[in-house]
Amino acid sequence: MSLNIFWFLPTHGDGKYLGTSEGARAVDHGYLQQIAQAADRLGFGGVLIPTGRSCEDSWLVAASLIPVTQRLKFLVALRPGIISPTVAARQAATLDRLSNGRALFNLVTGGDPDELAGDGLHLNHQERYEASVEFTRIWRKVLEGEVVDYDGKHIQVKGAKLLYPPIQQPRPPLYFGGSSEAAQDLAAEQVELYLTWGEPPSAVAEKIAQVREKAAAQGREVRFGIRLHVIVRETNEEAWAAADKLISHLDDDTIARAQASLARFDSVGQQRMAALHNGNRDKLEVSPNLWAGVGLVRGGAGTALVGDGPTVAARVKEYAELGIDTFIFSGYPHLEESYRVAELLFPHLDVQRPEQAKTSGYVSPFGEMVANDILPKSVAQS
């Protein structure tokens, strides 16, 4: 099975070490462009762009990097409850057209109640998933060309529609990650690809089985992906030394403050990440070559595959055997590590190389819209 390998744009910061300004790197547009172009040339299929108040806006970052890349796809965040699903569908179609079909979308319900309240979203965990289901139902149908009336508990629209369709038909794929039962129910009904953070293979297998069963009950099939950091070197010894070096500036106080901050999250996935290490830096290899050191201070994906190329490839294949076909990798610093992954890991995997993007023609091939709502009358060509 050919694997889709994505990279990551560190719009929330980058550097050689975690938890310190030592070795930190300024992340500006020029640096993000370097990473995106490297990923494009090295054969990564796409890049995940993170979302949240600690990050640059993922949509604007993607739009700014489309003109300087050729094949790379951009996985950007949809935020239910923060934006109208109809407006989000229009934005998604525009990004897909401007990128010639290189737009992918990642549904993010959010897991930090404090940040969500600051964004104006005052829903508890269950309510957020209710709203996310409603949002996604509308978003999908509008992108697929339907005129939508929807009267939900959280969202109501009447006559919602899209005038300019996306390049990808019937619409761009939807990705989503979540570990709660409500999240799995949403994935089973709504998404093309279910993402998990890098838990041990046995835990990942259990989640995949649960989502598969739920999807089958609705007559659907779902693809699977995983989000992991990678520390790959020419030897296993060098890789583990690099892992130790990455957290060499972390002190106990920084770890304790980070874990206290992350503990306020109501994200089940975040709780599962934290439980892998419990803030203890002495037992970080939680499964063979799966290292939880990143999660001592980083929210979200907190584990890394560590080893030489053949060793990391063997672990990747273990996940692939569970049914995972998409791997979203990252590493510190992200520019250099993109080369290491491509040079040391790719040769040991069957990596699906991206094709040249489609040509979109014109955004509006039929002239100006009549009264902002009606397609101009078609004239037969003789």
From Swiss-Prot:
GO molecular function, one term: alkanesulfonate monooxygenase activity
Lineage, uppermost ranks: Bacteria, Pseudomonadati, Pseudomonadota, Gammaproteobacteria, Pseudomonadales
Known role: Catalyzes the desulfonation of aliphatic sulfonates. Seems also to be involved in the desulfurization of aromatic sulfonates.
The keyword Flavoprotein is assigned to this record: yes
One Pfam family it belongs to: Bac_luciferase
Gene for this chain: ssuD
Protein's GO biological process: alkanesulfonate catabolic process
Enzyme kind, highest EC tier: oxidoreductase
Family assignment from sequence similarity: Belongs to the SsuD family.
Record protein name field: Alkanesulfonate monooxygenase
Catalytic function, reaction form: an alkanesulfonate + FMNH2 + O2 = an aldehyde + FMN + sulfite + H2O + 2 H(+)
